[in-house]
UniProtKB/Swiss-Prot annotation:
Catalytic EC class: transferase
Xref: Pfam families: RNase_PH (PF01138), RNase_PH_C (PF03725)
Cited function: Phosphorolytic 3'-5' exoribonuclease that plays an important role in tRNA 3'-end maturation. Removes nucleotide residues following the 3'-CCA terminus of tRNAs; can also add nucleotides to the ends of RNA molecules by using nucleoside diphosphates as substrates, but this may not be physiologically important. Probably plays a role in initiation of 16S rRNA degradation (leading to ribosome degradation) during starvation.
EC number: 2.7.7.56
Record's subunit section: Homohexameric ring arranged as a trimer of dimers.
Source species taxonomy: Bacteria, Pseudomonadati, Pseudomonadota, Gammaproteobacteria, Enterobacterales
Underlying gene: rph
Protein name: Ribonuclease PH
Species per Swiss-Prot/TrEMBL record: Salmonella gallinarum (strain 287/91 / NCTC 13346)
Length: 238
């Protein structure tokens, strides 16, 4: 029995609250159960130096956790004077995932920065960040079109992510913290709304997993992501 009584293929309740802050072009509070992340999308004219003159835009991301997002307080990385390896890995993942959602040529020479700040962590913070940031990005792009700065919306479709894993020999979807900490296999999967894979991060924490188990996990992820994308689209219609 899972901690919340969920079935193996069931994601936690997902809530996406748009326009959560007033200054950013896109802002979303995303909740996967008790995991809560504030995602904002900020638009700047211009692109990084390596893209100048190429007529395309750029999407980048930053990720962080509030000191008491976890069970015990973690010092702010700013106080330590540098970002940790985990933080850099996650923010690069978020950026890669969201670049797959956008036609960068159609975006033109704009840079959109996605800031994902974890308010409360209970497993799956990176997958929640990608899911919420995609909705914030959609809102920001809609504003570029509404303001006449773009003729065509460069959004190709929604992107979402979910964690899957093997816990006590059972393949399950959307792990909360107690499951994640006990997982024999832990995997994060990012997909487009039509089920194409953007990224798979998978590790056997204990016993190696089989090819058949990998396919089972990917199937679980696809089903979970289909549900999450439906929630994203419903949020954007409200």
């Amino acid at each position: 029995m899972r901690p919340a009584g969920r079935s193996a293929n069931q994601v936690r309740p997902v809530t996406l609250t748009r326009n959560y802050t007033k200054h950013a072009e896109g802002s979303v509070l995303v909740e996967f159960g008790d995991t809560k992340v504030l995602c904002t999308a900020s638009i700047e004219e211009g692109v990084p130096r390596f893209l100048k003159g190429q007529g395309q835009g750029w999407i980048t991301a930053e990720y962080g956790m509030l000191p008491r997002a976890t069970h015990t307080r973690n010092a702010r990385e700013a106080a330590k004077g540098k970002q940790g390896g985990r933080t850099m890995e996650i923010q690069r993942l978020i950026a890669r995932a969201l670049r797959a959602a956008v036609d960068l040529k159609t975006l033109g020479e704009f840079t959109i920065t996605l800031d994902c700040d974890v308010i409360q962590a209970d497993g799956g913070t990176r997958t929640a960040s990608i899911t919420g940031a995609c909705v914030a990005l959609a809102d920001a792009l809609n504003k570029l079109v509404a303001n006449g700065k773009l003729k065509t919306n460069p959004m190709k479709g929604m992107v979402a992510a979910v964690s899957v894993g093997i816990v006590n020999g059972e393949a399950i979807c959307d792990l909360e913290y107690v499951e994640d900490s006990a997982a024999e296999t832990d995997m994060n999967v990012v997909m487009t709304e039509d089920g194409r894979i953007i990224e798979v991060q998978g590790t056997a924490e204990g016993e190696p997993f089989s090819h058949e188990e990998l396919l089972t996990l990917l199937s679980l992820a696809r089903g979970g992501i289909e549900s999450i994308v439906a929630t994203q689209k419903a949020a954007l219609e409200n």
